[in-house]
Amino acid sequence: MIYWFTGQPGAGKTVLANALKQQLENTFHIDGDDLRDIFDNKDYSEDGRRKNIALAQHISHFLSKKGCNVVVSLVSPYKDQREEFKEKLEDLIQEIYVHTTDIRGRENFHVKDYQPPTSNYINIDTTNISVENCINKIIKL
């Protein structure tokens, strides 16, 4: 199974992804910042972002086919790219939209062209809910 955490920087994607990883067996975590470091991708244009997302999609699909659970934490702002991946994998992926109204110091990194999901996703507002409760909501679905 692939658990794809999407949302603005500072919403809690990586925190929740790490917590979910601890609850699942045979799980690999792919983080967007790590991918950028490994592949030296400092291109934050739409094209650069799309390439980083496509890379995460290919790696997560590969690992999933090998029997791993995969947890991805990545802004992944483009709805069309996420929807296409969900259509391809059908029941093998769960999109998790993480958002908050809290100010957490990463507002300068917000992606102006972020497109929230509109269908077939788990909605997690981290403003007033504990990490444990967020993870319980994800696991129960």
Regions found by a protein language model. Give the residues of each.
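Conserved phosphate-donor/acceptor-positioning beta-strand/loop module used by diverse small-molecule
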Residues: 71-77, 88-104, 124
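Hydrophobic anchor at the beta1->P-loop junction of P-loop NTPases
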Residues: 5
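The conserved Walker
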Residues: 9
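Conserved substrate/cofactor phosphate-moiety recognition/catalytic segment
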Residues: 17-61, 65
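Walker A/P-loop
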Residues: 14
